[in-house]
From Swiss-Prot:
One of its GO terms (molecular function) is metal ion binding. It catalyses: D-sedoheptulose 1,7-bisphosphate + H2O = D-sedoheptulose 7-phosphate + phosphate. It is an enzyme of class 3 (hydrolase). It comes from Chlamydomonas reinhardtii (Chlamydomonas smithii). The gene is CSBP. Binds 3 Mg(2+) ions per subunit. GO terms for cellular component: chloroplast. This is Sedoheptulose-1,7-bisphosphatase, chloroplastic. Pfam families: FBPase, FBPase_C. Its cofactor is Mg(2+). Pathway: Carbohydrate biosynthesis; Calvin cycle.
Length: 389
């Protein structure tokens, strides 16, 4: 019964997309072909010139449509309208609508489902909560009935599962921070979408889209598409629809920090010096312990830095496939930067060889990531300006 309901919801969401989404608005006035010919020109030459002008006109129209697609997404659009304006790929629109539908259902389950443990752990050793498993099932079902997903895997089911569709592969963390759900902290879903038929031997740079659902006082669906500018926030309205409420294209400088794994400062001197810098410069501490709300605040506030570092006695916990790479696409499309894997490189450029590949990470404004790399590695070759501590 649950599977049938999810199939109906996904089908309804896609049908709603077709009904409500309109083609990008643009001038459609026909341009008459111009024939340039002198009195001595032959009919053949006139026809050739006409053909060239027609071809030029068609090319201009195609370019105009492409430009319009990238510029017409606007605040107040529904998610379906935004996707039509942001990407010409109907399969990508379908997979994003399917993830949005699952996010909407998960929001209800987070408010009502059990927070008790299931007395089992996933293959990574993390305790699985009942609400984790509900979210995981909903996302797998949504992807299966989208018919555009080839493979999917999650933090709870890390081995890729054949979804029976074609077009994309999706990796997701169904409910990051779920251990805090009983305290009523914000929790969230993270996902990345890759083209093709594999989820290893890839990089985050190959993602065509990424997103996160944030379940707090408001339910928000935050997404970025590889070929469209900006990072976009959609608010779940009372009527069950997603409304475009914010576009972020720049993350500036501001004294706000979210330092994860502070225990690493005990035996990571460089991290200790960086934290002392933040404290000495009177940065505002804004850390919830959940990477989804902590990253989302950087996008919404358009400033700040998030760090989660390792040390000889505190190992990496964040997984590139399920968390780090999707969040890196969101942050970088919003105008920020990331630094990953103990190297001064973007998290989008780290090869993902296995599903359980883990890393340390920094996200934030370009200036803050540059400072992070200077403190941790002594240099930041990707960025031209040096940090003055």
């Amino acid at each position: 019964m649950a599977a049938m309901m999810m199939r109906q919801k996904v089908a309804g969401a896609i049908a709603g997309e077709r009904r409500s989404a309109v083609a990008p608005k643009m001038g459609r006035a026909a341009t008459a072909p111009v024939v340039v010919a002198s009195a001595n020109a032959s009919a053949f030459k006139g026809a050739a010139v006409t053909a060239r002008v027609k071809a030029s006109t068609r090319a201009a129209r195609v370019q105009s449509r492409r430009t319009a697609v990238l510029t017409q997404a606007k605040i107040g659009d529904s998610l379906a309208e935004f996707l039509v304006e942001a990407t010409p790929d109907p399969k990508l629109r379908h997979v994003m609508m399917s993830m949005a539908e699952a996010t909407r259902t998960i929001a209800h389950k987070v408010r009502t489902a059990s927070c008790a443990g299931t007395a089992c752990v996933n293959s990574f050793g993390d305790e699985q909560l009942a609400v984790d498993m509900v979210a995981d099932k909903l996302l797998f079902e949504a992807l299966k009935y989208s018919h555009v997903c080839k493979l999917a895997c999650s933090e709870e089911v890390p081995e890729p599962v054949d979804m029976g569709g074609e077009g994309f592969c999706v990796a997701f963390d169904p409910l990051d921070g779920s251990s805090s759900s009983d305290t009523n902290f914000a929790v969230g879903t993270i996902f990345g979408v890759w083209p093709g038929d594999k989820l290893t031997n890839i990089t985050g740079r190959e993602q065509v889209a990424a997103g996160m659902g944030i379940y707090g006082p408001r339910t928000v669906f935050c997404i970025a598409l590889k070929d469209a500018p900006g990072c976009h926030e959609f608010l779940l309205m009372d009527d069950g629809k997603w409304m475009h409420v914010k576009e972020t294209t720049h993350i500036g400088e501001g004294k706000m920090f979210a330092p994860g794994n502070l225990r690493a400062t005990f035996d990571n001197p460089a991290y200790e010096r960086l934290i002392n810098f933040y404290l000495g410069e009177k940065y505002t501490l804004r850390y919830t312990g959940g990477i989804v709300p902590d990253l989302f605040q950087i996008i919404v506030k358009e400033k700040g830095v998030f760090t989660n570092l390792t040390s000889p006695t505190t190992k990496a916990k964040l997984r590139i496939l399920f968390e780090v790479a999707p969040l890196a696409l969101l942050i970088e499309k919003a105008g920020g930067a990331s630094s990953c894997d103990g190297k001064a490189v973007s998290a989008l450029d780290i090869p993902i060889l296995v599903c359980d590949q883990r890393t340390q990470i920094c996200y934030g404004s370009i200036g803050e990531v540059r400072r992070f790399e200077e403190y941790m590695y002594g240099t930041s070759p990707r960025f031209s300006e040096k940090v003055v501590a």
